[in-house]
Amino acid sequence: MLQTLIGVHSYMPWCYEIPAMAIFLRSTITLPIAIASLKTARRFVQVQPLIKEAKKRCRTNTDFRTVRKKLYKRFNCHPLMIYALPITQLPLFAFASYQLRQAVDVCPESMSTEGMLWFTDLTLPDPHGVLPAVLAVTYLTNMSILKRPSDSRLLKIFNTAGIMSAFFVSFMAFKTSTALSLYWTTSAIYSLVQNVALRKLL
């Protein structure tokens, strides 16, 4: 992927290539998963009344878990599938960030001069902290949209982990190169627009 980044750089400056990279990866990899995840989430919400009724009816937790498992299978809405998107995004995030960090090391001269607006040097942290701040707000807004009320311990763990990761990545954005902050922020904004649009269209 590093060679591809350097190759594409022959046709556009880094300040455009980095956002384009984020949009391309989001559109080709995470968008299809997001669509499937949203459909699963809606089926999950629809089956909640049946699960609550089963919880009242079942005498033991073992019976309840058995019935709940059958309902998830029947409606094809296992809670884990709702979080297929963040589970997929984690390795993609790590891989893309690593490749971009390598690009900063390999191409320091062009990275230091091909920024834009207030961040002209992509090898340094955002001088005004604007991108990290936007990243934090976007992440938290996304989490509020994706959060699903549920008694499932697994979903509660994912919700908590999502909020913690949002604060961690936003904090790191204040310390790392603007190249990475630009990629993370573009990716987060794309994700937010994607989630809002899908909820209106699907």
From Swiss-Prot:
The keyword GTP-binding does not apply. It is found in: Mitochondrion inner membrane. GO terms for biological process: mitochondrial cytochrome c oxidase assembly; protein insertion into mitochondrial inner membrane from matrix; protein insertion into mitochondrial membrane; respiratory chain complex IV assembly. One of its GO terms (cellular component) is mitochondrion. Residues 36-74, 147-168 are mitochondrial matrix. Residues 96-125, 190-202 are mitochondrial intermembrane. The chain crosses the membrane at residues 15-35, 75-95, 126-146, 169-189. Pfam families: 60KD_IMP. GO terms for molecular function: membrane insertase activity. It comes from the Eukaryota. InterPro entries: YidC/ALB3/OXA1/COX18, YidC/Oxa/ALB_C. Keywords: Membrane, Mitochondrion, Mitochondrion inner membrane, Transit peptide, Transmembrane, Transmembrane helix. It is a multi-pass membrane protein. Belongs to the OXA1/ALB3/YidC family. Required for the insertion of integral membrane proteins into the mitochondrial inner membrane. Essential for the activity and assembly of cytochrome c oxidase. Plays a central role in the translocation and export of the C-terminal part of the cox2 protein into the mitochondrial intermembrane space. This is Cytochrome c oxidase assembly protein cox18, mitochondrial.
